[in-house]
């Protein structure tokens, strides 16, 4: 199985998406520490 075909499988895409969202939340919390505490 080729490497590019492996990168297009669902677990790899899901893992990359999870890492991207986690990093995004960390960066948002670094600049706006109380953003997730506000009651909506």
UniProtKB/Swiss-Prot annotation:
One annotated Gene Ontology cellular component of this protein: photosystem I
Membrane topology classification: Single-pass membrane protein
Disulfide bonds: none
Locations listed in the record: Plastid, Cyanelle thylakoid membrane
Pfam families: PSI_PsaJ (PF01701)
Superkingdom assignment: Eukaryota
Keywords in alphabetical order: Cyanelle, Membrane, Photosynthesis, Photosystem I, Plastid, Thylakoid, Transmembrane, Transmembrane helix
Keyword Thylakoid (UniProt): yes
Extent of the signal sequence: none
Positions of transmembrane segments: 6-26
Single GO biological process annotation from the record: photosynthesis
Function: May help in the organization of the PsaE and PsaF subunits.
Family per similarity comment: Belongs to the PsaJ family.
The name this protein goes by in its record: Photosystem I reaction center subunit IX
């Amino acid at each position: 199985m080729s490497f590019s075909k492996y990168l297009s499988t669902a677990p790899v895409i899901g893992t990359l998406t999870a890492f991207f969202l986690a990093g995004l939340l960390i960066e948002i919390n670094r600049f706006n520490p109380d953003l997730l505490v506000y009651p909506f």
